[in-house]
Amino acid sequence: MTQLEKACAISFKGEMKMELLEAIRQRHSVRSYLDKPIDTDVRNALCKYIDECNQEGNLHIQLIENEPQAFAKRLYHYGLFSNVKNYIALVGKEDATLNERCGYYGEKIVLKAQMLGLNTCWVGGTYKKI
């Protein structure tokens, strides 16, 4: 078993190891999205996983749906996004471990989204409320 396989087995309890490894290899940043809603079953699976990460990581990660304003303009350092109406906000109380927890659980969610057939793109920073 490779180091990556060992890490995957530990980090993603219950996930099919090969699905996770495939998701890691396939995952890439996407800035242009299809103009269609997230499939209900995919949405439910993603929300369930987000809830698990929130419980485990003491966070308040949220799936924001049907909200096109946040990415309507060009974002400095990231370029132009197209058809972004759904996104995940990584939210938690400010403390010494918040950035680490958001990065760890955010990446777990990004990989779960990839396994569910959703493309993603990390965007960092602090933004005003919409």
Question: Which role does the model predict for each range below?
Answer:
Residues 6-130:
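Acidic, surface-exposed loops and disordered segments
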